[in-house]
Amino acid sequence: MEKKHQILDALNEALKLEYSMIIHYPLINRAIKDPDIKQMVNILGVVSIKHADTLADAITALGGKPQWDFESAPDEIDLKKIFRAQLEKEKLALKLHNDSADMVNDKVLKTKLEAIAKQEVEHIKLVEKILDLIDQGKS
């Protein structure tokens, strides 16, 4: 039972990270002028919706209740600060997905979590690219 509780906690924490991106996406997107960065942020937003759905389904399948919680919006729109924080969130999400995949016994769920983890690796690269573009004066 303790293991199941740990898995549900990790999945709900990951859900909060994904849901925060979904909720904050319009605010962040409106602040971006560069079309390349806008497109990359759009990818993050769309995939976050898919991840949140998968996580909510996994939580429910394990007998838990998805906690639809999210972080409050940033007080100021400092894109560099926002994406530095997003980079840390992507890294945490990767860890949570990998940890959850390691703990679950259900092969289908394990495969889904491993797939999300692989996508998080790509998100980390994408956010790093966004930060590089912001450092170059684009935003």
Named regions from a protein language model:
Residues 1-139:
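Iron-associated oxidoreductase/ferritin-like identity signal
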